[in-house]
Regions:
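N-terminal secretory targeting modules
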Residues: 1-131
Length: 131
C-alpha cells in the first residue's frame, strides 16, 4: 500500500481553524478543538496515521496532592460528504496510531472531514500521513 506524507498532499488538504504544519517531521497538527482537515478521496481504501500525546486530568480536588490522575487522549470525528453527524468517533489512545477511514469493494469518491474534538490543553494530535 502506498503511503503519502502531509507534504505530498499539501495541495489537497484544506484546513479550518488553527492547524499548523511542523516541517521537520512533516506533521499537520490540530492546534485547537474543532480544528478540521478536509479532502476529497477517490478509491477503495484509505487509512490515516496520527501522532498523539496525552494530557492528564485530576480525578478529585486539585488541592489534594494525592489526587489520582488519568490520561486524556485526543478524540477525532469523521464526517463523510455533507452528513451533519459524524460517521464515527474514535480516541487516538497511543502516540502513533493508524485508523481506517474508508473501505469499499468498488472505488468511490467522498469528501472526508477529520475534526479534533478535544481541547489542546489536554492533548495534542497531528496527521503524519495517509495510506
Amino acid at each position: 500500500m502506498q503511503r503519502f506524507t502531509v507534504s505530498n498532499l499539501s495541495g489537497y488538504l484544506v484546513t479550518h481553524g488553527r492547524t499548523f504544519r511542523e516541517p521537520k517531521e512533516d506533521i499537520l497538527f490540530f492546534n485547537w478543538s474543532c480544528d478540521t482537515v478536509e479532502f476529497i478521496f477517490s478509491g477503495t481504501h484509505l487509512n490515516v496515521s496520527f501522532r498523539a500525546g496525552c494530557g492528564w486530568e485530576l480525578e478529585g480536588p486539585p488541592s489534594d496532592p494525592d489526587v489520582p490522575k488519568r490520561a486524556t487522549w485526543p478524540w477525532v470525528a469523521v464526517f463523510l460528504d455533507d452528513n451533519p453527524a459524524p460517521v464515527r468517533k474514535f480516541e487516538v489512545a497511543s502516540p502513533n496510531e493508524t485508523w481506517l477511514l474508508h473501505h469499499s469493494p468498488e472505488p468511490q469518491t467522498h469528501r472526508i472531514r477529520l475534526v479534533k474534538l478535544t481541547e489542546n490543553s489536554k492533548t495534542f494530535l497531528g496527521i503524519t500521513g495517509f495510506s
